[in-house]
Design a protein with these regions (language model features):
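Short beta-strand scaffold segments in enzyme catalytic cores
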Residues: 101-107
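Mg2+-dependent endonuclease catalytic cores in nucleic-acid-processing enzymes, primarily RNase H-like
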Residues: 111-230, 251-263
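Acidic, Mg2+-coordinating catalytic module of metal-dependent nucleases/exonucleases
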Residues: 233-254, 262
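ASCE P-loop NTPase helicase motor core
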Residues: 1-48
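Hydrophobic/aromatic beta-strand patches that form the interior of the parallel beta-sheet core
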Residues: 25-27, 92, 148
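A residue-level signal for conserved active-site and pocket-lining positions in enzyme catalytic cores
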Residues: 29, 58, 103, 147, ...
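ATPase catalytic-site recognition across NTP-hydrolyzing enzymes
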Residues: 34-94, 99, 113
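Short loop/turn segments immediately following beta-strands, especially the blade-tip
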Residues: 15-16, 107-110
Length: 263
């Protein structure tokens, strides 16, 4: 995947002189063109993957994952005024970095879209203070709130021995949804990117302008040069991380297995 050792071998095989000598030759066979892969499977993959992932998996493209992590994000497309709907579920993506503590407030829409309607960013804070602020904002709809935290919050211990998850439950936020262990960061990123724009061009994630930290995070988080590791030196990734927990939990990118068949 990406510019790996296999890409180096493929590049050697494209050398005309080595081809002339009969020493090396390489080809690209595009899965999407195969007569043995059903068209319906290709179309389903387009809807379930972001453009770069689809190009890599189905178009035999060596995709460079450097640059912006959330590359489909575009203010002109994804940012617009959004109205909180008291009749819909309230999802809170929660990152437990102490400075800042970052929460993203989301509402899944009946048409399949996901709206980020607000955010909460508290500096030099703690989990109890986050709960208090969420209580202040959403006490009327507390029964509709589901917390989607960083899974590490189940294990980080506080003074009385309770975890971050315990604190949420003690404060009355009883619906807490998280996996037992961290999913790979790449899977979480791919889930967000697919919601921003699928390979078929569909956008399902929109963000209200008041979510300034989230917008900044989606625009500016980059990969470390030459790797698929996020550059966290700027400390701006936390809101995007908070967004990623509910998105990956409820809209995960499926690991597709090409079964074949005929068109």
């Amino acid at each position: 995947k990406g510019f790996s050792e296999f890409h180096k071998l493929w590049t050697i095989g494209q050398n005309k002189e080595l081809q002339r000598k009969g020493q090396w030759k390489s080809w690209q066979f595009v899965t999407a063109d195969s007569p043995f892969v059903p068209t319906a499977e290709i179309e389903a993959a387009k809807n379930d993957m972001d453009p770069k992932s689809f190009a890599q998996e189905y178009l035999a493209s060596f995709e460079n994952m450097s640059g912006r992590v959330y590359y489909p994000f575009d203010r002109s497309v994804h940012v617009k005024p959004l109205q909180f709907n008291p009749k819909l579920p309230v999802w809170v993506g929660q990152d437990f970095n102490i400075d800042p503590m970052s929460s993203v407030i989301l509402q899944p829409q009946p048409n399949g879209e996901l709206w980020a309607v607000d955010e909460l960013v508290l500096f030099s804070s703690n989990t109890a203070e986050v709960c208090d602020e969420l209580e202040r904002r959403f006490w009327r709809w507390k029964s509709q709130v589901t917390i989607f935290p960083d899974p590490a919050g189940a294990y980080r211990q506080h003074a009385r021995g309770e975890s971050d998850i315990d604190i949420f439950k003690e404060k009355g936020f009883l619906r807490v949804d998280y996996p037992k262990k961290h999913p790979p960061i790449a899977d979480r990123v791919n889930s967000v990117n697919r919601m921003l724009m699928s390979a078929s061009g569909e956008t399902r994630l929109y963000i209200d302008p008041k979510c300034k930290h989230l917008i900044d995070s989606l625009e500016k988080v980059i990969y470390k040069p030459g790797s698929r590791d996020m550059d966290k030196s700027g400390g701006i990734e936390h809101s995007a991380d908070a967004l990623g927990y509910p998105v990956h939990r409820r809209y995960p990118v499926k690991n597709r297995v090409i079964l074949g068949g005929s068109r």
